[in-house]
Amino acid sequence: MAVQQNKKSRSRRDMRRSHDALTTAAVSVDKTTGETHLRHHVTADGYYCGRKVINK
């Protein structure tokens, strides 16, 4: 089992963790239906960029 040789300070630990923060998902509202969806993704009812692209 690995054991550290020297103690890492709180500052070093927190500097390492500075890149671990989560970001929120970019959500858009469709022009025609007003439905929220992820950016660059088709909505649940098949619209993309205001056009119907998938027929159910």
Swiss-Prot record:
Region (Disordered): 1-27
Pfam hit, one: Ribosomal_L32p
A Gene Ontology BP annotation from the UniProt entry: translation
GO cellular component, one term: large ribosomal subunit
Keyword check for Cytoplasm: no
Key word Ribosomal protein present: yes
Protein name per UniProt: Large ribosomal subunit protein bL32
Gene field: rpmF
